[in-house]
A protein has these predicted regions:
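Short, solvent-exposed loop/turn segments at secondary-structure junctions
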Residues: 32-34, 72, 81-82
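Post-HExxH zinc-binding segment in Zn-dependent metallohydrolases
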Residues: 81-111
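Short pre-active-site segment immediately N-terminal to the catalytic Zn-binding motif
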Residues: 50-67
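Catalytic zinc-binding patch centered on the HExxH motif and its immediate surroundings
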Residues: 29-51
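Active-site recognition of the HExxH zinc-binding catalytic motif
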Residues: 65-78
Length: 111
């Protein structure tokens, strides 16, 4: 019997961990949307750990794309060029968009 393929969100998480590992421990969580109103996801990063939270109230594709966005933020935080949170772009600076563009395009080729 053919082994059942994991859900898209799990495949995306595993692909990111393997292909774009981070220099710290990473945990990925799904929370109910009432715990994070108006957000699909967020990331918390410190020197030893990264926590990514994605709302449960999304389909597999939307949750996967949100995970890629949050992973891109985490990768951006590891660059030697610091994020200027006070600028107009803030955390969505040109480096973030380069990282996000690369990841989302590769992911679309995988599915």
């Amino acid at each position: 019997m053919k082994k059942k393929r994991p859900p898209l969100f799990i495949r995306t998480r595993n692909w990111l961990r393997k292909t774009y590992p981070l220099p710290m421990q990473v945990s990925v969580h799904r929370y109910d949307s009432h715990k994070m109103p108006k957000l699909l996801g967020y990331v918390e990063v410190d020197k030893k750990h990264m926590k990514i939270v994605i709302t449960k109230n999304t389909n597999q594709r939307e949750a996967s794309e949100t995970l890629i966005e949050e992973w891109s933020h985490a990768l951006r935080e590891t660059l030697a060029v610091p994020v200027d949170y006070d600028s107009e772009a803030g955390m969505h600076d040109e480096f973030f968009w380069l990282i996000y563009g690369k990841l989302i395009n590769e992911w679309r080729e995988l599915k």
